[in-house]
Design a protein with these regions (language model features):
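Membrane-embedded segments
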Residues: 134-140, 145-228
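Non-catalytic terminal accessory segments
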Residues: 1-135
Length: 228
């Protein structure tokens, strides 16, 4: 129900971003003003924008899995596109109504091409950074003092793991990397604090292998987890 209500907003937003992209590409090179090129790029854009819907409607298959992965990456990149374009348009709106020097150059065809290229570089940089951080386990160490008796224990080395998001994008290779880092910390106890699955359970490519990999976590007092 929520998806149906948000669908018109999503489509309008995608159309707005498409119009901005076409204007920028046209200012970069006249080849992007040709109808044939625009139609081809529009088909690709529609495929990306509707990949999440198409994947939902298709039966489970390798192609459906591919579309799910595409839609996951698309939604992540789309967020950066929206933020970058909105900030750029707000700055454009403000500068257009001020006595900004060289305003004519900024709002010329060449200026539009430069601004659009800067936006593209920002979007690509944040997208690559996001993909990298999602696929590489980050270890943060903290010392916490609890003002109560620990019985026979003076200290406890706890490893807290969160947001595994197993699914179409994160699988067994990532879990191998994570388990290796956990075991290197030599924990007394391991806690998995939710969001184990990103999509549905069926999104995991080989759940038996993932389970085998996770069973390799070594700790003195065991591993405790909550689904999310």
């Amino acid at each position: 129900m929520i998806a149906i209500c948000l669908a018109p907003c999503y489509l309008l937003l995608c159309w707005y971003l498409w119009r901005r992209a076409i204007r920028w590409m046209g200012s970069c090179h006249h080849v992007f003003e040709h109808k044939g090129v625009q139609i081809g790029m529009f088909i690709l854009y529609v495929f990306l924008a509707l990949s999440i819907v198409i994947a939902f409607l298709l039966p489970h298959s390798d192609f459906q899995r591919f579309l799910k992965m595409v839609s996951n990456y698309w939604l992540g990149v789309l967020l950066y596109i929206i933020l970058t374009v909105v900030v750029a348009d707000l700055l454009r709106f403000i500068l257009k109504r001020t006595r900004f020097p060289h305003k004519e150059k900024l709002f010329s065809r060449g200026g539009h091409a430069v601004v659009g290229t800067i936006c593209l570089c920002v979007i690509c940089a944040f997208s690559v950074l996001g993909i990298y951080t999602a696929r590489h386990t980050v270890v943060t160490q903290q010392d916490i003092t609890i003002e109560k008796s620990g019985g026979t224990l003076d200290s406890l080395h706890v490893v807290l793991v969160a947001d595994l998001h197993l699914g179409y994008s994160i699988g067994n290779d990532h879990m191998k990397q994570m388990v290796k880092k956990i075991n290197a910390l030599d924990p007394d106890v391991v806690l998995v604090a939710g969001d184990i699955f990103d999509n549905e359970y069926e999104a995991i490519k080989d759940p038996d292998k993932v389970a085998e990999t996770l069973s390799g976590i070594k700790s003195k007092y065991g591993v405790y987890a909550t689904y999310g």
